[in-house]
Amino acid sequence: MIYVENKDLVIPGEVLADDEYYSGRGTFKENGKICSSLMGLVSLRNKKIRVIPLKSKYVPKKGDVVIGKIKDVRFSMWDVDINSPYSGILPAFEVFGREKKELNKVFDVGDVLFLRVVDVDEVKKVKLGLKGRGMGKFRGGIIVDITPTKVPRLIGKKGSMINMIKDKTNCKIIVGQNGLVWVKGEEDMEQLTKDIIHMIEAEAHTSGLTNKVKNKLSLAIDGELPQEDDYSDDYEELEKPKLQNFKEELEQEEKEEQSKKDSTDFYKVIEELKKKNKKDKPLSYGNNSGNSYILNNR
């Protein structure tokens, strides 16, 4: 039995379903029930239930693009705040190669950069780099901070949401996977874009958000609502790829469980045969070919 619906807001400890469902991330099992371990939104797929956190900290991964702020300049590197519990470092050789320059003449404390995560070691030491299109120091503009888990909603399917905002406001917008967003344009458009971004963050779990954003932009810029278009909402599409291999995972788990069961059943049969043989002599059982297998009764 299921006690919640898809996209319901739940709190820690709330009962979600009976254990005929599969427990996913953000849930735990207790007394035959699946419960939420955090505050978030229910996601149901193929009898698997999980809870997507409303707020979470950014955990860096190799290859991520992030926005960071220089917080210290050292002898051979910069310390960078990447909006995460884990601090980043930008080594000088990632910028200069073998050249030697005074670091604070290139990037100083307070500078905001667009960077790539080059590596993350086992203790979460984050190495950053500047290789890639558009990487480097931002000049002007504002930084908007959102929950990292809402970044896919801001971008939209194939960039649909973020491109719509860019087109209407004529602002340059760069989104970091760590939840920091750089916006540059006319001052009033920067503020409008900031408001729109926070609206998307607050209503990321709702349906019809694309149309809401389009209407707000049109009212603010054109003074009227746009003509009605059939804008499909992209929320469901963003969730699908994460669970595409769920069936394969279940089949693999079932095979492993069956293998363990078969192995256990075999040894149970052998133990039963040993118990039935009360005389101190070997047990034997045969196969169709006439061969016998001997088990020492010890």
From Swiss-Prot:
NCBIfam families: PRK04163.1-1. This is Exosome complex component Rrp4. Residues 276-298 are annotated as: Disordered. Non-catalytic component of the exosome, which is a complex involved in RNA degradation. Increases the RNA binding and the efficiency of RNA degradation. Confers strong poly(A) specificity to the exosome. GO terms for biological process: CUT catabolic process; exonucleolytic trimming to generate mature 3'-end of 5.8S rRNA from tricistronic rRNA transcript (SSU-rRNA, 5.8S rRNA, LSU-rRNA); poly(A)-dependent snoRNA 3'-end processing; RNA catabolic process; U4 snRNA 3'-end processing. Residues 63-131 form the S1 motif domain. It comes from Methanobrevibacter smithii (strain ATCC 35061 / DSM 861 / OCM 144 / PS). Keywords: Cytoplasm, Exosome, RNA-binding. Belongs to the RRP4 family. CDD domains: KH-I_Rrp4_prokar, S1_Rrp4. Signal peptide: none annotated.
